[in-house]
Each structure stands twice: as structure tokens, then as C-alpha cells.
Amino acid sequence: MANDRLRALEDVEKEIALVLQSAGTIVLELSKEKANASLLDRQLNQFQTSINRVESELSSQIRYLTQVATGQPHEGSTYSARKDCQMALNRAEYARVKLGELGRTCEMMLDPQT
């Protein structure tokens, strides 16, 4: 799934290159005294098609990122479970240390000779 998303972003990058190429060709053609109308039409269509593809794919990527960034565990991810487990272990260790301190304090109070 992640590889598919990366490939889609690589395709978007290629489409952006096509957008820039089409825009450059259009500007170059418009700078001529007599512009080739059919070339301008073809490049404009290519430009618009590429822009629409880029917009569509980026919107899809943003929707996906919005879904996975809502705090819900991502399908296939164990990060949340591992983090919860680690935090529980930390709390247990903290409780063990505090109980040890409490035990030593109680012993000192019950046995004032030490």
C-alpha cells in the first residue's frame, strides 16, 4: 500500500513536469509573431489534462492522509499497541519503585533503631 502511494506521487511529479513543459511550449509559441493555433490547442489540452490529474491525485493523497491522521490506529500498524504496552511497563516500574520507597519508610518508622 505504501509503495502504491509513493508510485502515485512519482506519477504526480511526472505530470507536474508535463505541466511545466506544456506551459513553456505555450509561452514560447505565444512569443512568436505568428503563433501556431493547432499547437497551442494541443499544448493547452495537455496542460489542462495534466493539471486535472495532478489535482485529482493530490486530493486523493490528502484524503488518505486525513483518514490516517485522525488518531485511529492505521490498519496493519502495531505502533499504538506497542506504545500502550511500553507506557504500562513504565507505570508498573514506577509503581514498583514507589512501593519500595514506601516499604523502606514504613520499616524505618516501625524500627527506629536503624
Swiss-Prot record:
Give coiled-coil spans as residue ranges: 28-61
Query: What is the tissue localization of expression for this protein?
Result: Ubiquitously expressed at early stage of development. After fertilization expressed in head region as well as in lateral line primordium.
One Pfam match: Med11
- For this chain's UniProt record, which GO biological process terms are given? regulation of transcription by RNA polymerase II
**Does this entry carry the keyword DNA-binding?**
no
Offer a single GO CC term for the protein: mediator complex
Q: What happens when the gene is disrupted?
A: Knockout embryos do not show any morphologic abnormalities at early stage of development. Small eyes, small brain (microcephaly), and heart edema are observed in mutant animals after fertilization. Mutant fishes show also reduced response to sound stimulus, suggesting compromised hearing, and increased movement after light stimulus, indicating compromised brain function. Decreased survival is noticed compared to controls.
Q: Where in the cell is it found?
A: Nucleus
Q: Write down the PANTHER family for this protein, in alphabetical order.
A: MEDIATOR OF RNA POLYMERASE II TRANSCRIPTION SUBUNIT 11 (PTHR22890)
Family, similarity comment: Belongs to the Mediator complex subunit 11 family.
Task: Give the protein's function.
Answer: Component of the Mediator complex, a coactivator involved in the regulated transcription of nearly all RNA polymerase II-dependent genes. Mediator functions as a bridge to convey information from gene-specific regulatory proteins to the basal RNA polymerase II transcription machinery. Mediator is recruited to promoters by direct interactions with regulatory proteins and serves as a scaffold for the assembly of a functional pre-initiation complex with RNA polymerase II and the general transcription factors.
Q: What is this protein called?
A: Mediator of RNA polymerase II transcription subunit 11
